[in-house]
Amino acid sequence: LATKRPIILRTFWLLSNREFAQSSGVQKLPRTFYDRDTICVAQELLGKWLVHKAGGVERVGKIVEVEAYLGEHDLAAHSSKGRTERTKIMFGPPGHAYVYLIYGMHHCMNVVTERDGHASAVLLRAIEPVKNLAGRTQGPGLLCRALGIDRCLNGHDLLSDDFFIVEPNVAEKISIVKRPRIG
């Protein structure tokens, strides 16, 4: 059986970052967006806005770097060792957040993709600040810190009203660079 090659996707914006437009008119990504091939989802997440509303503050970041994990056959994926208490979210339905702690101090967020039981996900590696974000956002741990994402959001439905991904209401032309995953 041929396996898909793991990749990191990073965007390089051809247009300058635009002022955040009011949230009216933006649509949450539907469940069907996530219930597709992981590499397709990873590519199409680039340029989307990740929104987390907490404590009366709406934080928004534009997704600019992602990494695809392709299920149990992908030895770099947490799911490669089978279903565990930690990884059970990856085996669940698409469109949910898989959030975990690394090195005992940094949270990382993945978006679960493909059908229930497939155990694939896309790691969000970096965002560009759009609204109410301060500090660095380049790297999975810094992204989560800036958006206030922690293990309390593990398993959270990304179609909820407080944590979701949207298509921005202004399309931008982007160029996508694919690179082999490191490590």
Regions picked out by a protein language model, each given a short descriptive name:
Residues S23-G183:
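Conserved, well-structured core segments that form or line functional sites
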Residues A2, E19-A21:
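Acidic, Ala/Val/Gly-enriched low-complexity intrinsically disordered segments
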Residues I7-I8, V26:
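Short hydrophobic transmembrane-like helices used for membrane targeting/insertion
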